[in-house]
């Protein structure tokens, strides 16, 4: 059976693990920058220097990473999952 693919969690996890700086635009027009340190179903923790912001996901309009994020699985990841 095909594995479920959660785009949002995969995207945020790649940003978090690779420490890719992001710009987060909120629905009220506010913009903040930083690195995603953690996230759950409802919030994400954004860190910028010594400042931390806990942002509710329902308030987020757009997340723009500073570098390209490849969301598809690598060839070796797929073969490892098939072996299990």
Curated annotation (Swiss-Prot):
SUPFAM superfamilies: Sm-like ribonucleoproteins. GO terms for biological process: regulation of DNA-templated transcription; regulation of RNA stability; regulation of translation, ncRNA-mediated. It comes from the Bacteria. Pfam families: Hfq (PF17209). Keywords: RNA-binding, Stress response. InterPro entries: Hfq, LSM_dom_sf, Sm. GO terms for molecular function: RNA binding. Residues 9-69 form the Sm domain. One of its GO terms (cellular component) is cytosol. Homohexamer. Belongs to the Hfq family. RNA chaperone that binds small regulatory RNA (sRNAs) and mRNAs to facilitate mRNA translational regulation in response to envelope stress, environmental stress and changes in metabolite concentrations. Also binds with high specificity to tRNAs. This is RNA-binding protein Hfq. It comes from Thermosipho africanus (strain TCF52B). The lineage of its organism: Bacteria, Thermotogati, Thermotogota, Thermotogae, Thermotogales. The gene is hfq.
